[in-house]
Amino acid sequence: MIDTATLNGARDSINSDFQGIVLVDSLGTEVSDVIPTSSTPDFTPTYVWDTTTDGRIQLAQDVPFSIAAGVEVAGWRAKSGTTDIGGNWTWDTGFILGEDFNTSVTFSSAGEFTLEGIPTYIQISLV
């Protein structure tokens, strides 16, 4: 059994890298703009991760994404970013982690996809 302090230490370490969230298609390609989930030098996020449950990182609220016509949405990924020497924020390539949905949806016309906060989480378990 892992003690709560160790479990939450792992959770908090991973959470510090979760700076944005993006939707992906079934190939893992980004299909939406990145929505910031932590503060950057010039931005305070609307959407954040909740860490009040031991060992869990969960979206604190639903996150809406604008989706173009013909785009498939099949999952979400957490991203990190960096500030360059000039103080400009850029998103890192690649993802930290995320989840694929049981089924994907393809938008026949432009619309909105809402990633629901309650079922969107990462459960940390150290074995």
List each model region and its residues.
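Small cysteine-rich, disulfide-bonded extracellular modules of the LU/uPAR three-finger superfamily
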Residues: M1-W76, S80-V127
